[in-house]
Amino acid sequence: VGLNTYVTKEESTESSSEEESKTEVYSVKTDDIKSLEFIIDKKDTVFEKKDDSWVKKDETAFPVNQTTLDSAASALEKVEADRVLENVDDLTEYGLDSPSNSVTVTTDDGTTKFNIGDENTSTNQYYIAKDDEDSTVYVVSSSTVTPFMNSLYDYAQGEDFPTIDSSTVKKVQVSQDEDSYILEENSDGATWDVSTDGSDKETADTTAAGNVTSGLGSLAYDQFVDYNAEGLSKYGLDKPYATITVDYQEEVENDSSDESESDSEASESVTEDDTDSTEDTSGDGIDSTASDDGSSGDSSESEAAADSSDDGDSTETTTVDKQLVIYVGDNADDGSRYVTIDNKQVYTMSTDTLSAIIDKKASDLWSLIVNYQSVKTLDQLQVTYAGDTHTVNVSRETSTDDDGNDTETTTYKLDENEIDSTTFTTFYNKLVNMAGQKRLTESYTPAADAEMKVVFADTDNNQTTVTFYSYDTNYYAAVVDNKVFLVNKMTVKEMFTAYETLVNGNAKETETPTTTAEAE
């Protein structure tokens, strides 16, 4: 115990001694600082205080990040040296013969200049010299120096990328030289169509469409590059690598005072229209819906009221249609890409994030489901296999029990003989839930006759034909109209086996009809 107490006292004494040995080099109240001048990107740069805000002296429009400059000023509030080297003859040993930076602090009392030399990476310290005291070198913590060692746009206040709720995305259009597509949500709100130019639409894979929309919801800026780009060509934005146009929706709260004012203005407008119905309202073509974040809104679509509590208070919201256009330019040095949404401010954005949206063809988003036909709407199924053709007819009958509950009974007949519903739906599920591993985009000519041909007829008398050909050792080609899906050979053979079981082992003359569930 005695030894431990001694060691603890010794450590405490050493720590206290180190604190006492620190030498104050400079102190200032941050509120007294009028300007800071230091080198940024090899240029002398001055930030000065005007009306309690930092501005860039030679470029007052520059969007200075006030927090960053306040932090830099705070680093000088009390500059202390861990060591003081006096009577230094050779400044080259400390990198002070040609300083990497210099920081000049101006107050009402005058100016103080610090030259910054080399960094001692092993101790996380810098060598600095104050004013023109060339023979004295101070060793200070890196926290005193690093706030002044950044690039210009590290001192800029950028904007956040507009928030997109991926669940509200209605349409995505990507325009590139070769890889362009249009992805559109269907009216059911659950499925998507994809095309190259808006025509010849194909059903989109739900997961692939979800990856695109979730990618949009994840977009964020990396680095702020230019707040007022006059030459977009240096970022490749005069002729963008890709243009992304997103139609989405946003819920906004209505301000009650704004609503009252709007209602009043609307009333006045109606009066004016009644007074002069011949006034020209054709407009000059200017889009008055454009917003500062690069998106446009139309709040005329729909309105909804949401109760916020049980005391009768409610918040009225409006569903606003928005459109955001994102221009994607060249690669930056770090591998990211330059982007802009207003052709003025330029940022970088991760290529990993963008890759969820760009560099895709419409075919990359195609659904690979060969042909889904719900059993609830199936009327007839005709199958030709191994030289024989069999037909399954579906009939439905609704009965009502004593309590008034309706029950639908579905009966399946194979060539006029009733068959077990479970055996049929086992085969049918394998048939309609079949997915290809890829689709051929080039023309296809079968090398042999079809091994199976299936004709679907639904309750609306629509017919679809699916034909299966052996493609190679790994795949069958499932052909639907002009679409050719390559399906794993084992998947197709399992379906063939289920069909053989249906035909060879389960046909029967009579069976009590059973209620069946939807085929998955």
Please identify what each model-predicted range represents:
Residues V1-E520:
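Soluble, acidic/polar mature domains that operate outside membranes
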